[in-house]
Swiss-Prot record:
GO biological process: translation
GO molecular function terms listed in the Swiss-Prot or TrEMBL record: structural constituent of ribosome
Pfam families from the UniProt entry: Ribosomal_S16
Protein family according to the UniProt entry: Belongs to the bacterial ribosomal protein bS16 family.
Entry annotated with the keyword Ribonucleoprotein: yes
Cross-referenced InterPro entries: Ribosomal_bS16, Ribosomal_bS16_CS, Ribosomal_bS16_dom_sf
Disulfide bonds: none
Key words of the record: Ribonucleoprotein, Ribosomal protein
The protein's name in its UniProt record: Small ribosomal subunit protein bS16
GO cellular component assignments: cytoplasm; small ribosomal subunit
Superkingdom as given in the UniProt entry: Bacteria
Keyword Ribonucleoprotein set for record: yes
Length: 108
């Protein structure tokens, strides 16, 4: 069973609110989850400390058991200075290198 750390949408229409959950890879986005480990409210200002709340101890537990975070969750984990396993760090760095523009070969 592959486990992911991902966002599950909730809230009213045009007023999104996301739960950060541990869920089975096969379950739907807003479907059943194993554990809620935080929440994200994009409606709050970026400098508000309540915009992203994480249970760091539980996230570290699930990462040590092989849970794979999504790209957005990786960004949140980096904001909270949570160390990721080496395999996830390598995978994330490879994706960042793909977005770097290559210099043009025209020298004239």
């Amino acid at each position: 069973m592959a486990v992911k750390i991902r966002l599950a949408r909730s809230g009213a229409k045009k007023c999104a609110y996301f739960k950060i959950v541990i869920a089975n890879n096969c379950s739907p986005r807003d479907g059943a989850f194993i554990e809620k480990v935080g929440h994200y409210n994009p409606m709050l200002p970026k400098d508000n400390h309540e915009r992203v709340i994480l249970k760091t101890d539980r996230i570290e537990h699930w990462l040590s058991h092989g849970a794979q975070p999504t790209e957005k969750v990786i960004n949140f984990l980096q904001q909270f200075s949570i160390t990721l396993p080496l395999a996830i760090q390598k995978k994330h760095n490879i994706k960042l290198k793909n977005y770097v523009a290559k210099p043009s070969k025209k020298s004239k």
